[in-house]
Amino acid sequence: MKTEVKIIEDSISEAGARLTTFQLAYPRVIHAEVMTHRVFSRNASSSRAIPVAKMVASIADDPFMPMYWGLNEPGMQSRKELTDQMGVKAAKALWSHAARVCARVATDLYELCGLHKQLVNRILEPFSSISVIVSSTSYENFFALRCHPDAEPHIQHLAWKMADLYYTGPQPTVRKADEWHLPYVSAAERESLPLETQKVCSVARCARVSYRTHDGASPSVEKDTELYNRLLGGLDKGDGEPGHLSPLEHQATPLADGKAASGNFVGWQQFRQTIPGQATPFDYAKAVARGWRDMADLLSAREDEDPSVLVRR
């Protein structure tokens, strides 16, 4: 499993504020550490949406296999690596065995028990990759923490690939006032499509990482528009149904003040912040009346059951 890093869109305002969008693929086991950086706008492929057979096949073909076998010692860091060749061979064999067992159990839960992929795929996550789109005006803290030798080795690997590209790659494109940072919108589309349509297409294409990996398929403005409208949900109806608006955070236009904030961006007006009602209010009483809490009540009634009884058997 390779850690893949691409810069999809890189822009800098005339005031000097830089906005960069990365497309990433990395081991699922380090995703929680990426998620701790709240200045990031991100969308990621969800194991709730990927068919079980596809997840199992990806693990069979290309499972996550640690590239650094750190020896046990006190604390969070492992400074010494397992170097004995027989030991490394045994560790890889045991890890591969665990992946095969989990794949078999996941398949049985799906085929024999008829369970949904949102549950079954959880078993496969330690061996899977995840595709992520990240946009931010502030990467310095991420690099300072995750490029440091104290960071977990595999997130160091990701962070250094990102830092190398960020600092030594091509220079960002200068965007003037009223010009837009639009990931996945081609130069030809910038010439041929109205600006509002370009925004819609960019939003939908950023969102699709949640449903499928970008595979080079020809984009469709019609399908992009359909997905965009689904993401907005009930915002235009005022019925309290939440929108799914995180894909609207990757598009932005420069602010005159390079230090002014908009959402989690600095120096750029974030598209999401221009959408009326983008922060959906929560009506507790109405949610209860609609039955939104039914699942939580069901699980509350079951959480005192002792699963260890089954495990010990």
Q: Which residues does each PLM region occupy?
A:
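A conserved ligand/cofactor-binding region detector
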Residues: M1-R313
